[in-house]
Amino acid sequence: MASQGTKRSYEQMETGGERQNATEIRASVGRMVGGIGRFYIQMCTELKLSDYEGRLIQNSITIERMVLSAFDERRNKYLEEHPSAGKDPKKTGGPIYRRRDGKWMRELILYDKEEIRRIWRQANNGEDATAGLTHLMIWHSNLNDATYQRTRALVRTGMDPRMCSLMQGSTLPRRSGAAGAAVKGVGTMVMELIRMIKRGINDRNFWRGENGRRTRIAYERMCNILKGKFQTAAQRAMMDQVRESRNPGNAEIEDLIFLARSALILRGSVAHKSCLPACVYGLAVASGYDFEREGYSLVGIDPFRLLQNSQVFSLIRPNENPAHKSQLVWMACHSAAFEDLRVSSFIRGARVVPRGQLSTRGVQIASNENMETMDSSTLELRSRYWAIRTRSGGNTNQQRASAGQISVQPTFSVQRNLPFERATIMAAFTGNTEGRTSDMRTEIIRMMESARPEDVSFQGRGVFELSDEKATNPIVPSFDMSNEGSYFFGDNAEEYDN
């Protein structure tokens, strides 16, 4: 992992703070989630939601989306300048589900964005509380990562659909700041850069003039973010080449795709945070919990504790399996879409199955779905153990590459081997090592070839009992070395469509 010299911890990024000590970080993260909770309670009052309706995850998501839309400056400005039929740029809303005479009903609500902003600021001591907004974006992003596949997006940019484990955070909006950049996977950054380069190839003026200068700054910043995720000198050197290119074109796209592939074995460091739905924070605040005083961390025991004591409900379609719906939301809550299923199952204390075996669709209900047949059930979001979230890719002993099955990006800091099919990955690297990046490419391939699937990552790290809040007694699980690792195996999920 890169030295902590200039880096801020995720929580500092999350709360926009400068360097703080652990207690200050815990307090400011606590203030952030407490503000989300207070906002949620106020919205439930405004909408006259019953206790049960306020615990419905679909209602939580609608309320979260409303506040994100109310603060989306860029889109608001765009909507005002390009009035479209039937869209009031000053209003935001969505479906709210209510229980009436033993049935669920959908009600579409509309609110003034100004009013939503007022309620949000009031819940956050009069501040804009951008950190809280980013936190909600990351929760939505983690939910998308667990729910949808990005095959189409990968293929469009010339990447291999099997690289899905690199796509964490691919649906995060551009405005998600440093906290958002920290949770983006290598593939996500590569895809953003490739899109940018392609626009430059097709549009001669993209890099020119005053606008072009801004574009260039954005390009270099994205390159630096991606460079910071790589852990080997050769990968970083290659990123320098891509960043310094005079006018980026197909050579850079090639280099980026090469780097993305290499990240399947030489994994990048990608942050993981447990971001929970707003209703969970609301429940805790309503029960009198003082987040700011108690302090809170997104990467420790706190989210597990919170989920242990929260009852959240979800609408269930006629042929969906409530246990599977629970698994989906559990994975989203812990940002574990790309984690090894053996590790997730052990921590959760229940078997976590690959997505192809889930009988459940996404959490959100489309406006044309029939409410007559909708039921609701409790989401089982509790866990048997807790573990610390990681921001490293789990590469063994410092700089050496370690194994990485074609789809694992570790979430939990727990000892395991990272099973992978070297033949499958290496097949993508035949030939092309000429050109200006040849020596780096050769070096990267050499490191990948020396990686062994039996090497152990996160040596000595274990899970903890939920009573062990100070993390004193690690329980190191032993996993069979079989390739049971990938959530995306035999995948049949829907595509993510904006």
Swiss-Prot record:
Where does this protein chiefly localize? Answer: virion
Motif Bipartite nuclear localization signal: which residue numbers?
198-216
Post-translational note: Late in virus-infected cells, may be cleaved from a 56-kDa protein to a 53-kDa protein by a cellular caspase. This cleavage might be a marker for the onset of apoptosis in infected cells or have a specific function in virus host interaction.
Q: Where in the cell is it found?
A: Virion; Host nucleus
Biological process (GO) annotations? symbiont entry into host cell; viral penetration into host nucleus
Superkingdom of this entry's organism? Viruses
Q: Does the keyword Zinc-finger apply?
A: no
Annotated region (Disordered) at 1-21
**Key words, A-Z:** Capsid protein, Helical capsid protein, Host nucleus, Host-virus interaction, Ribonucleoprotein, RNA-binding, Viral nucleoprotein, Viral penetration into host nucleus, Virion, Virus entry into host cell
* Keyword flag Ion transport: no
Q: Name one GO cellular component term.
A: ribonucleoprotein complex
What positions does the record give for the motif labelled Unconventional nuclear localization signal? Answer: 1-18
GO MF term list: RNA binding; structural molecule activity
Q: Name one Pfam family in it.
A: Flu_NP
Q: What does this protein do?
A: Encapsidates the negative strand viral RNA, protecting it from nucleases. The encapsidated genomic RNA is termed the ribonucleoprotein (RNP) and serves as template for transcription and replication. The RNP needs to be localized in the host nucleus to start an infectious cycle, but is too large to diffuse through the nuclear pore complex. NP comprises at least 2 nuclear localization signals that are responsible for the active RNP import into the nucleus through cellular importin alpha/beta pathway.
Assembly notes: Homomultimerizes to form the nucleocapsid. May bind host exportin-1/XPO1. Binds to viral genomic RNA. Protein-RNA contacts are mediated by a combination of electrostatic interactions between positively charged residues and the phosphate backbone and planar interactions between aromatic side chains and bases.
Member of which family? Belongs to the influenza viruses nucleoprotein family.
- In Swiss-Prot or TrEMBL terms, this protein is called Nucleoprotein
Q: State the organism named in the record.
A: Influenza A virus (strain A/Duck/Beijing/1/1978 H3N6)
- Taxonomic lineage per UniProt? Viruses, Riboviria, Orthornavirae, Negarnaviricota, Polyploviricotina
